[in-house]
Amino acid sequence: MGAREMPNDVQATIASLMQRIDELESRANLRDLVSDYCIGFDTHDWDRFISIWHRDAIWEIGPPFGSFEGHEGIRKAVFEVLYPVWRETHHLTTNLRLTFTDPNRAHGTCNVDCMGATKDNVVQMISATYTDDFERSEKVWKIAKRSVVIHYFNSIPGAQMTPPSSS
């Protein structure tokens, strides 16, 4: 029995299942984008980091950093604003909530805690919320816009970021 010969309820069930599978796969892809942001930035893996953004994406980091547009703006943010300040960073995202507005657009919100050390060895703790607009183009999900709201950005006096000693 071909697709044209299937009863309408079977066709509707298959269409519904295909839509649900697509959403599950999309959710996994979007979680990977959020993780690749952290991994790419923290490990200085530029190719991984830039691959998550649409060419004309907007990255609103907010004060004290600013807003940046497109791959060139994002490159400027990373290499001229952020990396020159930070010796190392460790981003941890959690509580990712995704809402699909249509099959090719989604909205996401997650929290991030980032511990980092500046080039002058001051350990900082940052807590923020990322709000993302994701878009799928040519079957690939990417970030179209990320807005950052920083809740706190504090130094931790006396803290050091050193690996454990091997004894």
Regions of interest found by a model, annotated:
Residues 39, 64, 124:
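Short, charged/polar micro-motifs that form catalytic or ligand-binding hotspots
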Residues 46-112:
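A solvent-exposed, acidic/Ser-Thr-rich amphipathic alpha-helical stretch
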Residues 25, 66-69, 122:
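A structural signal for alpha-helical segments
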Residues 2-18, 82-167:
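A beta-strand edge to alpha-helix "cap/lid" segment located at domain peripheries
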Residues 37, 57-58, 152:
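Short secondary-structure capping/turn micro-motifs that flank functional sites
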Residues 32, 69, 129:
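Short, well-structured alpha-helical interface segments that form or flank functional binding sites
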Residues 2-39, 43, 47, 51:
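Short, low-complexity N-terminal intrinsically disordered segments enriched in polar/charged residues
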